[in-house]
Amino acid sequence: MNYRILFFLFIIPFFGLSQKTKLDLKNIEKNISAPNSIYNYDRLIFKYKGLPKSIDSIEAQHLYYGRNFRKDLVSQSEDDFKVLAEAFKKNNFTECIRLGKVLYAKDPTNLDVILILLRAYDQTKDIGNFSHHIAQLRLLTDAIKNSGDGKSEKTAYKVNSVGDEYIFLNMMNVGPDYTRTSKILKDGVIDVWEKGENKIYIKVLYLDFNF
C-alpha cells in the first residue's frame, strides 16, 4: 500500500545493533502455546502492550514469528481493515485512530495496523501514543533484522508475509530501482532484491508449516 512509502520517509533510521538469534519456528510454536512458558504468547502480548521497551530480542522473535501459529489475526482482506485503509487514504486521522484501536486490540502485532496508527498519532500530535507504538514497531522489525543478514539464501531475512516484506524493504531504504527475482521453496519463497552488485535475500514464510 502507498502509505508505507510515505510513512517510512521519517522512520527509516530504526534498526539498532543487536545479536543475531537463530530462528527455530517449531520451538516458537511450542513455547507460545505452553501455559507455563516464559514465552507464552498471551503473557508476551501483555508485556508488549504495557512496556514494549522491556521486551528482549528472544521475546520479540516469539511475538513476531509466533503470529504464524495464531488464528485471531487481522487480514488486509477483511472489511474492517479496508475501512481503516480508506480512512487513511482520505487523511481522516481521527477515524483512523478510532478504527485502528479496535483492530489493534484484536491483533496488536500487526505491522499494517501499527503503521496507520503511528501516522495518525503523528498527524494529531499525540506524542505519547506515537512513542509507544514506535517502540513496538522497532522491536518487531528488529526481530526480522535479527533473523539473518540478507546476504545469501541460507542467511536470508525472514518475514511472515509479502506485506511485511515491503515494510521491511522501506526501512532498509530499498527503493523501486531494485529488481526482484523469486524462488519457490517448500516452506516459503526466497526473493532476491538486486541493484548492481548489491543483493538482499528475503524469505517470505508460508503460514502452513509442514516440515
Task: Please annotate each region the language model reported.
Residues 111-116, 132, 148-150:
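Alpha-solenoid helical repeat scaffolds
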Residues 1-23:
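Bacterial Sec-dependent N-terminal signal peptides
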Residues 20-90, 144, 152-211:
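N-terminal alpha-helical interaction modules that lie
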Residues 80, 114-117, 121:
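TPR repeat positional signature
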Residues 122-145, 173:
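TPR/TPR-like (Sel1-like) alpha-helical repeat modules
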